[in-house]
From Swiss-Prot:
SUPFAM superfamilies: FKBP-like, Triger factor/SurA peptide-binding domain-like, Trigger factor ribosome-binding domain
Family matches, as PROSITE patterns: FKBP_PPIASE
EC numbers: 5.2.1.8
Name assigned to this protein: Trigger factor
Length: 444
């Protein structure tokens, strides 16, 4: 095999590779002989088919197979012998494919950069932390109690007020004709509550028990029933009972109803849940600070195609948000060229940080264990109730899908390693300070 380097520009490399015709013929003959051993044709005993007939019948398909095998093996050998580390699958272009002559093809690839790791021990960070206050725990308990409210009759005679619940019968009509799904009996409706079409529950305010009222509403344009979307409708409402939502007293009995031994145990669990939420924010903030610090020390060149692929993924989301008028406030008012330039910088930063973290992990032996992958697969499967086994089967049958789980786990383990090596000082602050003016949504 003869290899000639044709391009060496930054991380880009190009080669012309020639494989002798004798090597090709040896492979082809060997493959045809393997076929002949098992080939069964009428008039011939198994394994006794003449080679000329084998070539006539299977020569073309064997040539294709041998060519693909030769190119792949030659490319892998060239990459290995030269100690190259491709960032992506090499691009191959066939130049001469006549198997009776030397096969010639071109290989283009982009290399992973040589990365000099920063002194992780010199990285200094402040990790903001917060602890749940008694007030935060009380508020969380009140929210739990609100979700456990019971409806009780209102004893006084008065019209329905905002926040009350009316038990009603109703009949809905469009163009004077009742429509399917527009009739209800003994339904409890919260006055000005959510979950109804606009104006439905709001117009029940002021109704008294025994009173009937006709209200006019318009179904939203995006309503789930196409026949009703955007159409005006009338509902005849009859009020049958007035109720109010009463939250339970937060005491030991309340905790017992939730399956716990005491209010003290409930407070303990709620406190830990809040602490976990605070710790997640703390983790995201210190991770962002760490990545900012590493980015300042990551001045190496990055493979252009990796950046382009990352940018295309980002831009697909940004462009959809732009067209739907969902851009962040910071991006509104920017023209497309400016947005593209901004997000290309983000893409380059992400690729650079990803390569740096990967190299830190490689050099320091960070690995993702099978038990971690299994936990991740189970966690992903739990997001699809009733389809858990199908999700697990999908992962087992698709190694690339498993790799999509491996990447985030690996990244977090490398971050953990760096945080253990770096100088990290913990600073306790209020939850308001922990949450203040900080984008912790990603690594960009």
């Amino acid at each position: 095999m003869q290899v000639t380097e044709t391009l060496s520009e930054g991380l880009k490399r190009g080669f012309t590779v020639q494989v002798p015709a004798t090597d090709i013929e040896e492979r082809r003959t060997r493959r045809l002989a393997e076929l002949a051993k098992t080939l069964k044709l009428p008039g011939f005993r198994p394994g006794k088919v003449p080679m000329t007939l084998v070539r006539q019948r299977y020569g073309r398909s064997v040539e294709t197979e041998v060519l693909e095998e030769t190119v792949n093996e030659a490319t892998q050998t060239m990459v290995s012998e030269r100690g190259l580390r491709p960032a992506l699958q090499p691009k191959v272009e066939l130049v001469r494919v006549d198997l009776d002559q030397d096969v010639e093809f071109k290989v283009e690839l982009e290399l992973l950069p040589d990365i000099t790791l920063p002194d992780l021990g010199s990285v200094s960070l402040t990790r903001l932390k917060a602890e749940p206050s008694a007030e935060a725990v009380d508020k969380a308990l009140e929210e739990i109690a609100q979700r456990q409210r019971n409806l009780e009759p209102v004893e006084e005679v008065r019209p329905a007020q905002k926040g009350d619940f009316l038990t009603v019968d109703f009949v809905g009509k469009t163009d004077g004709v009742a429509f399917q799904g527009g009739t209800g009996t003994d339904m409890d409706v919260e006055i000005a509550g959510t979950g109804f079409i606009p104006g439905f529950s709001e117009q029940m305010e002021g109704l008294s028990v025994g009173e009937t009222r006709v209200i006019d509403v318009t179904f939203p344009e995006e309503y789930g029933v196409p026949e009703l979307a955007g159409k005006p409708a009338q509902f005849e409402i009859t009020a049958k009972a007035l109720k109010k939502a009463v939250a339970p007293v937060i005491d030991d009995a309340f905790a017992t109803k939730l399956g716990l031994d005491s209010l003290e145990k409930l407070r303990e669990i709620v406190t830990q849940q809040i602490q976990n939420e605070y710790d997640q924010v703390s983790r995201l903030r210190v991770k962002r600070a760490l990545l900012d610090a590493l980015a300042d020390q990551a001045a190496f060149e990055v493979p252009p195609t990796l950046v382009e692929n990352e940018f295309n993924q980002i831009w697909q989301r940004v462009d959809a948000d732009r067209k739907a008028d969902r851009l962040d406030e910071d991006d509104k008012g920017k023209d497309e060229d400016t947005l593209r330039a901004d997000y290309r910088k983000i893409a380059e930063r992400r690729v650079r940080l990803g390569l740096l973290l990967a190299e830190i992990g490689r050099v320091n032996g960070v690995q993702v264990g099978n038990d971690e992958l299994i936990r991740a697969m189970r966690a992903e499967a739990s997001r699809y109730p009733g389809q858990e086994q199908a999700v697990l089967d999908f992962f087992r049958q698709n190694p690339q899908a498993i790799d999509s789980l491996r990447g985030p786990i690996f990244e977090e383990k490398v971050v953990d390693f760096v945080l253990e090596t770096a100088k990290v000082d913990d600073k306790f602050v209020s939850i308001e300070e922990l949450n203040a003016d900080e984008d912790v949504a990603g690594i960009a």
